[in-house]
Amino acid sequence: MRQAIFIGAAGFVGAILRFFVSSAVAFAAPRNFPYGTLTVNVSGCFLLAAFLTLFRERAAADGLRLAIAVGFLGAYTTFSTFAQEIYDLGKAQRILAAIGYAALSLALGLTAVWAGVRIAHFIEKY
């Protein structure tokens, strides 16, 4: 039960941060593309990869790992909004934008995971 409370508390923080980051990016960027969701999902990929790499072999950190990975980053990132935005772009007859958004999200997400792992390995060295 205690673990569920930590996951929920971390999820609350992740959801609030997603709202602020996505809103700030959407305010600053053109409104014709889902830049806010792209930003939170790509940054979430980076953070999850770095965090899991740094804490992969620390058994004492299992509770922290769940709170951050499942709670905080699970609430911070959003696959359902990503899918809905692709659908909305397609429904608006913006097929190339929908395909581009999906491809860009995947490419940047995988690049962010790679960068997160590399930076975590660099941190571990020093």
Residue spans for each PLM region:
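Membrane-interface helix-loop junctions in multi-pass transporters/channels
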Residues: 1-126
